[in-house]
């Protein structure tokens, strides 16, 4: 672990700081005084190098942060626009449905004001059939009118529904008596023929 730490430090620190930290301590006095001269001049360059490295690292992190924020903002904007568009579409659909319902309701109330509803059509139909049956049963054409029309214009028929033909006239009691007497005489003749045979 102790050997790895200085390696990491060497990689992290710039070369000027590495030269200063890892310089040999067994230098002579003249050598130290001679080294101080260029060291004082090289300290400015070392600071600039460190600043450049820090600025590069900071700028790279800033660029990454800006990119991440931009991507996040784009995602948020896309989601917000999608939700807003979805809400608008729902509102439009609701408005269209309401308009169609109002149109249908208004047209039904205007056009179907005098007409009966479909549930009430059956009784009106039965009433109509009853009304149709009544004029058929009630005689509009009297026999006197029929006779006069037939005498005046035999080719023309009676207008309107005419009454059914009258039933045959009932036989009078005299006719019934005559028929019974005829039957009696016929029966007596049959009996005489049977007896003679």
Curated annotation (Swiss-Prot):
Main localization (coarse): membrane
Membrane topology: Single-pass type I membrane protein
UniProt keywords, alphabetically: Glycoprotein, Membrane, Signal, Transmembrane, Transmembrane helix
Cellular localisation: Membrane
Segments traversing the membrane: 62-82
Coiled-coil segments on the chain, per record: none
Signal peptide per UniProt: 1-23
Residue ranges annotated as Cytoplasmic topological domain: 83-197
Biased composition (Low complexity): 147-161
GO cellular component terms, semicolon-separated: membrane
Glycan attachment residues as annotated in the record: 19, 26
Sequence segments annotated as region (Disordered): 94-180
Extracellular compartment spans: 24-61
Basic and acidic residues bias (residue ranges): 96-107, 125-136
Classification via InterPro entries: C11orf87 (IPR037670)
Pro residues composition-biased segments: 162-171
Name the record gives this protein: Uncharacterized protein C11orf87 homolog
């Amino acid at each position: 672990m102790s050997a790895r730490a200085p390696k990491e430090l060497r990689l992290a620190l710039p070369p000027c700081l590495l030269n200063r930290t890892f310089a040999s301590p067994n230098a002579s006095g003249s050598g130290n005084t001679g080294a101080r001269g260029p060291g004082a001049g090289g300290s400015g360059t070392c600071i600039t190098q460190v600043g450049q490295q820090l600025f590069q690292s900071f700028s790279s992190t800033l660029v990454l942060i800006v990119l991440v924020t931009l991507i996040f903002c784009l995602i948020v904007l896309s989601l917000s626009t999608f939700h807003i568009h979805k809400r608008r579409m729902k509102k439009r659909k609701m408005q269209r449905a309401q308009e169609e319902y109002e149109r249908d309701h208004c047209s039904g109330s205007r056009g179907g004001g005098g007409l009966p509803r479909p549930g009430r059509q059956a009784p009106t139909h039965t009433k109509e059939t009853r009304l149709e049956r009544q004029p058929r049963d009630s005689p509009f054409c009297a026999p006197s009118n029929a006779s006069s029309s037939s005498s005046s214009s035999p080719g023309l028929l009676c207008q309107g529904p005419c009454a059914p033909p009258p039933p045959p006239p009932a036989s009078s009691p005299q006719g019934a008596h005559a028929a019974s007497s005829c039957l009696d005489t016929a029966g007596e003749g049959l009996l005489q023929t049977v007896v003679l045979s």
